[in-house]
Structure formats: structure tokens, C-alpha cells
């Protein structure tokens, strides 16, 4: 299996962006291509067809490669849950919770074996693997326990691209410093440099590129202009960089920026809708009068519920709902909208019981069993009879109160969610719900009707069709600005995984 690796001088340099583009470009060439990230730290997760959990970014890269996501593409997923701890997902299954200083001792050897085995498995089905690193490959204090960067590149003898973010400044120092801190055998693997997020006239950079190529002996493959809307962010920090203002005609949907927000990829289909403004609102801000409020998923539901309460946002939401405003909770947000959340085994932390917002007739008990599965079900609202798909990722069971005549199941599978008769209070466990185009438009039309706006057409495809177009545009963008021939020519005819 031939191997390409993308590493970055810093976090947010554009590794995911470039890896995704490469996957689509290689697919166009007719290669059987797979993405790979040995270890990912993220709260955006996806569930595979066999119920395994993996990073959502690697699922997108799999779709770019024209293949089905599988856990071997991301054998280790670390999901931060606060207090310097992370849940460890290995080969799709939760295997424990660990602190950073304990991770190397308890999981390093096991993790590397999972990575090596996954690469061997992928080699049976694919011609080319495009690997993505994490952070920087030159973190001296972390290098001995780095499972993601040059250890993988060396294992595969991968043709490696170093990508750097010029927008933050210091790009030449970042590139040269990174190269100098690599071991000689690692540096030999770097076959090209890409400069990302350039603003301004390209010719102004020419003298710097000439110097960089002469100094390092490594070609600069391209300069990618700043294109922040071409690819979704993998990390919740990037929500801070999303900008824009709603017009008077826009439907404004507030998504609460929880401290431990998870799976905010749920809202990409809403962001892609013209006439919809998604506002990721910090808890300390005033809610105002949006068209809808969504409480998203959370890795630590009780802690984020307490943050809602302590900030005063919980009271604002309850007042807003009392006045007829539309409120939706997804996964952890669904649990928060209920009466109580109990954690008798202290799985999330030291709080054993917490009062919810009381907007839904629901009680939740967090337990050890983690539910991860894909779902297909039939909707009851709005309207009834639509087939929708999505996936569940939650650690807890929710029960509907007996005295809840005003609430109806959202789906045929009643445990997945509920809605009140007025259709302004919603809650469900289904991630990816807004990916279903007809259902999304019907839900938005409810909001538009309240504003006196005309309804949108509902006979549309699902978001995956739109995403395919976005992936093609991303690949076109990369192909226009990056010369990949030196990388492709550097690949051996046969590169067997050791």
C-alpha cells in the first residue's frame, strides 16, 4: 500500500483540509484510497455501520475517498471530558478514561499495536493511504509518546507533506524550525511544503518561497489562498472563528456554545441553508429573541447543565420557552431539557444528581453502557411518515414520565425523542437528524411560518448530496493551488506495510 502523510507545523494549519482534498483527488485518479489518522482528539464523532465510534473528520475523509467509514481509519479517538481527563475509544469501543499523564503508561503500547494492525487491515483493501498527523510532529516533550505523526510516517515510509499556516504569521520560522527538530530519517520523508491560508498578492511571496526551497532543499508544492468556508472545522475552538451577521430575512438559530460541546457537525446542514443564520452563542451572552434555540450534545452533560444554570442561560431558555419560543435538545441537550439527570456511579464526575430545565417529561440515568449505533426510523413530526437516518452516541437511559399526554414521540422508535403538541419543544438522541433534507426543511418551515415567511420547498435531497459537491469543490481548490506531481512521483511502485 502506497502512503502519503500530511503533517502540520502547528494545530489548525490545514491538515484535515488537505488530507480530505487529497482523498478526493486520488479517488478521481482511480486509486482505491483510504484516509487514516492513528489517534485523534475530538468531540465530533461518527458511528460506523457496525456500531463503532470514530472521528467525524475521518468519516468525511472516507466519503471523500468514495468509501465507507470504518474504525480502522481512526483506531484511537480521545474524547476530552474535562478535569484533564479523556475517554479512550480504541477500535470503535470505549475502553476507559484516563488522565494525560497516565495515558502513555496505560495505553501507548496497546495503542501502537492497534494502529499497526489497522494499517495492515487497510492494506488488504486499498492501494493508497492518506494519513493525517495531529498538532505538530516536533513537540519535543511529547515526541516519545506521539502515536500520530512521524512514527506513522516512518512505519509506512510515507511521502510526507508539511503544511503551514501563514495567516497567523511566522510561517518561515515554523517550517524551518519544524524541519530542524525532526530526526534525519524523518526529515528525509518530507517531500514537499504547502503554505496555507495566504491573503494578498501571490507574487509578494515569491522571494520567500525561493529562499525556503534553497535553504531546506524541499520544494514548495503550492500556496493555498484563505478559504475558510470550504471545509468544516474539526475542533470546537474553530467555532470562535465563524463569522457573519444575519440579515433581517434570515432565520436565526442559536446553538449554545457549551463548555464541552460535542458533535456540532450536526448543524452543518443548517449552516449550508441560505436564509438560515446559525449563531454559536456563549453562555454569558443574552439570548435575545431567536427563532429557535438548540442545546447540542455534550461530553459531560451534568457539568454543562450546571454551567447553563450558573450562567443564567438556563433561566433565559425557560422564559423563552414559556413565551412560546422553539427549543430543541440533541443527545446531551435532550437530557438537559428533562426533569432530572442522575449519575449514581459518578461516571461523569462527582455530582450524583442534577435538576434539569424541566421542559420535557423526561428523567435520565447515566450508566456504564454506551450506546453507539446507526438508526433508520419514521418520523411522527413534522410531518409524519418521513424516513430519516442518523446515529446515537450516548451514555445514559432516558425514560418518559407517565403524565406526559401533551408530548408525542418524534419517531416510530419512541425512545429516540419527543415533541409537544405545539411543536415548540423538541428533544431527541438522533445525531445527523438535520442531514435529512425533507425533515430539515419541514422543521425550518415551522419556524418560517411563525415569522410569516413563505415555506421552503421540501422535495430536496439529503445533505450528503450537498456534501459531495462541497468535497468536489474542495478538491478542485486544492488541485488548482497545489502541485502534487512531486509527491505522486516519489511514491514507490509497491510500498508494503512493514
From Swiss-Prot:
GO BP annotations, alphabetical order: cobalamin biosynthetic process
Domain GATase cobBQ-type: 250-439
InterPro entries from the UniProt entry: Class_I_gatase-like, CobQ/CobB/MinD/ParA_Nub-bd_dom, CobQ_GATase1, CobQ_N, CobQ_synth, GATase_3, P-loop_NTPase
A GO term for molecular function: ABC-type vitamin B12 transporter activity
Known pathway: Cofactor biosynthesis; adenosylcobalamin biosynthesis
Family: Belongs to the CobB/CobQ family. CobQ subfamily.
Protein name from the UniProt record: Cobyric acid synthase
Organism: Synechocystis sp. (strain ATCC 27184 / PCC 6803 / Kazusa)
Gene: cobQ
